[in-house]
């Protein structure tokens, strides 16, 4: 496949999170049940540490479960699946492409939001998203839907490959067309020249639609993919604004990089005041996180300029600009001086291996600290990276004052960290194929594990284990411990570019072509019996 553009995807105070209506053991958004986006599945026990994906039935791409081990079910996706899986209220949502066409009235290259039944993996409905007419400069062919859906009650929020923020009914059209948006039949054929489609109960139902290209003039570079965060009645998203095909020009330097929308109506409520546009290295593919610092909420965002920002979540009206702004609280340049200029003082140009990078990973807020790593588009290859732990209680430019610790042993990374609250260990993968284990408080390195292949997804910590896969299809289970212990290594028959997730005692691993639900009944029963005995 040419130019795999995105795992740049390669996702509140108690009671303030709308997705609390999902079951506590669900995984309703990128980061599970925490707006801090820590890749940790709290309360998960009895998860499998060994499994086999099984063989395909002869002449098909259907998994023969009799040849598998600890596989509850396996569902066919498309041929490229980068978006991370979310699970809420008995439904699974995952992004993919249309190469495994489920409906003949929607042929050709499309992005797909797929909804499956959590218990069986059976198909429930899909939202078909047509490709942008402008082509690969904004919407690279065959990539599919890259955003990890966010579920809040009976609504789902996602950034489409058309650079839209969509609010969607989790039941699709099966319970009618709820509106106010009623033009789904037209939408699914946008830019195709086809008349409105005849839709049914297995098609998606859009509640509202906010087109960031039309409304804000943004210019996404090759792909749009932010995983939305919902805080109270507000939706926050990265706009994916970036460079054009020349890789030297930002067509819309004044367009915002980060916005707030009304969760019920989709109305624009605010945009960032950071002025990131002119300084974008390449594209912008980070997703926001949220935390409460000294009683005040902060939104954390990794910019395409290599700077990590904290914004006040409450928009403030600016009379001079006649705009509502999300005001900066602090900002931190994550590129050390030696990544910007060499020993002779000469500027190191992006995207040189020894040079500066943007931030594609999601900032993680944990224990009143913010963790973030730098990296680049995987097409740019390997290079130097930087992992930092920041103090979010500071104000203004905290590049000099805000570092609690930093780690330059990591290479370029588009992965989000995972921290185990039980032992204070931090795990993070990098694009060069290394899994790093550090002390989250001090930054002390404990060990490095070599996967021997590029890694796009993030580590997941759950049940005392660390789960992670790579682009060769290798999937490892490591012990969450200061001593490196490999519990198992499994080969899946397709690359793994996304992050494993856990919901209701089941581990989900998405390859490019299949979603596997992994469950060890014996271990799960033993864990349940142990809890009951206590």
Regions found by a protein language model. Give the residues of each.
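Bacterial N-terminal signal peptides that target proteins for export
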Residues: 1-10, 18
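C-terminal segment of classical bacterial N-terminal signal peptides
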Residues: 14-23
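Noncatalytic, solvent-exposed loop/strand surfaces
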Residues: 22-534
């Amino acid at each position: 496949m040419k130019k795999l553009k995105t795992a740049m995807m390669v996702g509140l105070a108690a009671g303030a999170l709308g997705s609390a209506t999902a079951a506590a053991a669900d995984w309703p958004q990128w980061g599970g049940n925490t707006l801090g986006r820590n890749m940790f599945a709290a309360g998960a026990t009895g998860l499998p540490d060994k499994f086999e994906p099984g063989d395909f039935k002869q002449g098909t791409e259907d998994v023969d479960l009799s040849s598998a081990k600890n596989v509850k079910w396996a569902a066919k996706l498309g041929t490229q699946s980068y978006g991370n899986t979310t699970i809420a209220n008995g439904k699974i949502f995952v992004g993919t492409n249309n190469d495994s066409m489920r409906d003949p009235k929607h042929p050709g290259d499309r992005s797909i939001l797929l909804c499956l039944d959590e218990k069986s993996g059976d198909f429930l409905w899909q939202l078909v998203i047509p490709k942008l007419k402008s082509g690969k400069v904004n919407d690279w062919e065959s990539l599919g839907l890259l955003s990890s859906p966010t579920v809040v009650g009976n609504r789902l929020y996602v950034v489409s490959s058309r650079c839209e923020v969509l609010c969607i009914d989790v039941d699709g059209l099966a319970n009618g067309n709820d509106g106010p948006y009623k033009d789904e039949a037209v939408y699914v054929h946008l830019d195709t020249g086809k008349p409105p489609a005849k839709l049914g109960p297995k098609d998606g139902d859009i509640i509202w639609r906010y087109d960031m290209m039309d409304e804000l003039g943004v210019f996404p570079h090759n792909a749009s993919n932010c995983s939305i965060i919902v805080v109270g009645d507000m939706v926050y998203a990265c706009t994916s604004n970036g460079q054009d095909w020349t890789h030297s020009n930002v067509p819309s330097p004044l367009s915002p990089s980060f916005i707030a929308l009304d969760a019920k109506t989709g109305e624009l409520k605010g945009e960032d005041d950071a002025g990131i546009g002119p300084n974008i290295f390449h594209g912008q593919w980070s997703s926001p996180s949220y935390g409460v610092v000294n009683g005040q909420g902060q939104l954390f965002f990794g910019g395409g300029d290599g700077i990590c920002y904290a914004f006040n979540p409450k928009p403030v009206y600016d009379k001079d600009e006649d705009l509502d702004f999300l005001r900066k609280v602090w900002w931190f340049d994550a590129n050390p001086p030696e990544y910007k200029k060499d020993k002779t003082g000469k500027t190191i140009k992006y995207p040189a291996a020894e040079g500066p990078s943007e931030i594609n990973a999601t900032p993680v807020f944990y224990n009143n600290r913010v963790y973030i790593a730098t990296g680049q588009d995987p097409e740019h290859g390997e290079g130097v990276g930087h992992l930092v732990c920041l103090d979010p209680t500071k104000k203004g430019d905290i590049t000099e004052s805000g570092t609690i610790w930093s780690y330059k042993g990591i290479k370029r990374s588009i992965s989000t960290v995972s921290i185990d609250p039980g032992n204070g260990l931090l795990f993070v993968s990098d694009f060069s194929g290394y899994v790093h284990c550090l002390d989250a408080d001090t930054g002390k390195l404990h060990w490095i594990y070599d996967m021997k292949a590029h890694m796009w997804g993030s580590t997941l910590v759950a049940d005392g284990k660390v789960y992670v896969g790579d682009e060769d299809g290798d999937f490892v289970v490591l012990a969450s411990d200061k001593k490196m212990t490999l519990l198992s290594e499994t080969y899946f028959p397709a690359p793994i570019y996304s992050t494993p997730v856990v919901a209701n005692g089941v581990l989900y691993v998405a390859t490019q072509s299949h979603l596997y639900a992994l469950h060890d009944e014996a271990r799960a029963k033993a864990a349940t019996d142990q809890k009951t005995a206590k």
